[in-house]
Amino acid sequence: MTVAYSLENLKKISNSLVGDQLAKVDYFLAPKCQIFQCLLSIEQSDGVELKNAKLDLLYTLLHLEPQQRDIVGTYYFDIVSAIYKSMSLASSFTKNNSSTNYKYIKLLNLCAGVYPNCGFPDLQYLQNGFIQLVNHKFLRSKCKIDEVVTIIELLKLFLLVDEKNCSDFNKSKFMEEEREVTETSHYQDFKMAESLEHIIVKISSKYLDQISLKYIVRLKVSRPASPSSVKNDPFDNKGVDCTRAIPKKINISNMYDSSLLSLALLLYLRYHYMIPGDRKLRNDATFKMFVLGLLKSNDVNIRCVALKFLLQPYFTEDKKWEDTRTLEKILPYLVKSFNYDPLPWWFDPFDMLDSLIVLYNEITPMNNPVLTTLAHTNVIFCILSRFAQCLSLPQHNEATLKTTTKFIKICASFAASDEKYRLLLLNDTLLLNHLEYGLESHITLIQDFISLKDEIKETTTESHSMCLPPIYDHDFVAAWLLLLKSFSRSVSALRTTLKRNKIAQLLLQILSKTYTLTKECYFAGQDFMKPEIMIMGITLGSICNFVVEFSNLQSFMLRNGIIDIIEKMLTDPLFNSKKAWDDNEDERRIALQGIPVHEVKANSLWVLRHLMYNCQNEEKFQLLAKIPMNLILDFINDPCWAVQAQCFQLLRNLTCNSRKIVNILLEKFKDVEYKIDPQTGNKISIGSTYLFEFLAKKMRLLNPLDTQQKKAMEGILYIIVNLAAVNENKKQLVIEQDEILNIMSEILVETTTDSSSNGNDSNLKLACLWVLNNLLWNSSVSHYTQYAIENGLEPGHSPSDSENPQSTVTIGYNESVAGGYSRGKYYDEPDGDDSSSNANDDEDDDNDEGDDEGDEFVRTPAAKGSTSNVQVTRATVERCRKLVEVGLYDLVRKNITDESLSVREKARTLLYHMDLLLKVK
């Protein structure tokens, strides 16, 4: 039964509770808690004063300190949920009194600030009310003070309950999380963006006359102008565009204008994608100059939102990163923001600076303009000093742990691509001890959770809680792993400072224990598991660098089962969509469905790729015994381009200098047809491979302008390089692939002025040149040109049939594929990034007498004894002539002037060799 309270009683209670936190708590306990039934039942028939009194008292009661909220417990959340779902004031927003709307929105802001993830079903009503209020009142300058502050409170609410995280500056995340909208919500977003733009333009127009660049450029006039004819335009002088200066301070004097501008501009950053490109505010030079002037404002919120507005395009627009001039203007103000106190909740200078460094580390790692600018200041040393102070704290609370995590992340970004910062950080001998302790603490927490999993599962079942919160230090340990990954990129650090078995042991333990979590503790829910799977991916990223050829810890990792752990993961349906889930794993499948695992897959393959770099054939077959070729090929069409890239790069290293593995790969792409031999009557197999067709189609699908897709294409090209290096029969298979030759032509034809399709990438060009090189190099002769001259094949001379009866070419272009081929010796593998090259591998293959027997993927064999070197030379000459016919000779000659030194040198060597072959008659 609802207890009725009069207006006077409500006001009396409200006045008695001001400043008394404990008295407020009493109203959440019986019997006083019955008052909430009255307060939540706001009827349309209630008078304005009664509605306002109920809203005021609700606001007073819910305005509790964190300690008092803990005392109240879940009942506080129940009241918030009831306010969201039971009150009907949102649906009648356009009909309500302006003061009632203001108090209601202010109450919602209080609730959203405490529980930002609590769903609010009536948000669309408030958006419609906001749009109507802006268009019908604000733009016509008819707003009362109550309506202005209501607009401000609405903007705050939209920021709090919006589904996007406004502090996320990572471009890939920004694109992935951009919501799919229906036609209705699409229109709603457009109207929201339009209303926000109207607010921004109306307020900014009041202060545009404050833009002043007179102290930068003198404007020459031909005759004096009367004061009445002078119009302030900061772009009257054409030299202004060339200056790096920022205009004088623009001061927003009106506090309502200041709040409206900062909140509207911040929210506009979320909806601006709805505005056509030519109408966006950031494309308006005058408005951009206005925002630059706001960087010097007295209002911290204005300065912070100006920074966000100016920096966001670097993460959301393709070519904006090239504008380093503007970035150099903004960076000092971003650095200065570290001293702002207090900072608005939606602004994190650590995250912004870290995201900028990461962005340029990916695009221009050797010339990061952010680090270059910071190097001219003492900012980095100040950050390191504060970082050391955080590490020296005897214990951490939630706030200090978050701050320390931010310091670790930004130090990881500093050290990711710059050796001097790695050495600077590693000079602190205690840093690695702190790192090891951070990893050990997380391992202990995981072990404790696994040991208590039965009790925890029972508790979650009884409380009907489907998701547990993540382990409290997940961000902390992830930051340490990122820092370790940055350190491990240094060759000298791997051989000296990081030569600690304990670090490798801790990495393996984290990987193993976290995988056990995914197998046994999936009941904890996605909120718990997502951070742990993210930690798995980062851990594998660090292990990638610890298993490189020159690392002292590679053997330790192998002895302690890194391949076995990866084999378990790659055969798990969670990480391999080609594997079927067992019938008894339905609960696990449902619990973990949708969790992103692409980083784990990509880095697992990357670890194997590094292990297979420059290794013996014996080691390759040991790997394939545990992780067979079929399992590797499961990831060749993965939805994530990064996974595909690592899969092709792994195949590149496996096929290098290994004829057997080349044949295994061809076997996996075989089409076999059985026919009757007309002479003997025996059944024979006619085999062909669709590997090249698959590779050609894959390259056509790839966009080399994307970094990961470019790496995938590079891997494919080097697989073809390795195929062409095996023997004459494999060369013949490659030379017949017209589509692949066309793709190579498209890559080699590009220049700096015409690079629309493939980006004029030097790595892709070099790979194409290596394919051509191996097609034309004699697989069975160590010194091809010397041998040709010794056999009388000097320029202008062609031996007749009488001189050499076996000089005819027996490997035809159009012959059907059949069994058997004459063996050829590998020669001249490229020294590319990950293409392994080992002379001993030739001996390994030569000792395998039965290697080529029954090989289906070769040309029709010549007669016994017809394997003369002249015969092979003839096939090489024919291949060279075909390359000339398709225009590749001209493209090779064109690339001798390429801007890349490696491409120029390879093109010159190849051109010289082709010229020699073309002289053979």
Swiss-Prot record:
ARM repeats lie at residues 491-530, 551-592, 617-656, 683-725, 729-777. GO terms for cellular component: cytoplasm; GID complex; nucleus; vacuole. It is found in: Nucleus; Cytoplasm. The modification Phosphoserine is found at S226. GO terms for biological process: ascospore formation; negative regulation of gluconeogenesis; proteasome-mediated ubiquitin-dependent protein catabolic process; protein catabolic process in the vacuole. Residues 829-855 have a biased composition (Acidic residues). Residues 822-867 are annotated as: Disordered. The keyword Ribosomal protein does not apply. Keywords: Cytoplasm, Nucleus, Phosphoprotein, Repeat, Ubl conjugation pathway. Disruption phenotype: Negatively affects glycogen accumulation. InterPro entries: ARM-like (IPR011989), ARM-type_fold (IPR016024), ARMC8/Vid28 (IPR038739). Belongs to the VID28/GID5 family. Identified in the GID/CTLH complex. In the absence of stress, the complex exists as an inactive anticipatory complex (GID(Ant)), composed of VID30/GID1, the E3 ubiquitin-ligase RMD5/GID2, VID28/GID5, GID8, and the RING-like subunit FYV10/GID9, awaiting a substrate receptor to form the active E3 ligase complex. When cells are shifted to glucose-containing medium, the substrate receptor VID24/GID4 is induced and becomes part of the complex, named GID(SR4). Component of the GID E3 ligase complex recruiting N termini and catalyzing ubiquitination of proteins targeted for degradation. GID E3 is regulated through assembly with interchangeable N-degron-binding substrate receptors induced by distinct environmental perturbations. Required for the adaptation to the presence of glucose in the growth medium; mediates in association with the substrate receptor VID24/GID4 the degradation of enzymes involved in gluconeogenesis when cells are shifted to glucose-containing medium. This is GID complex subunit 5.
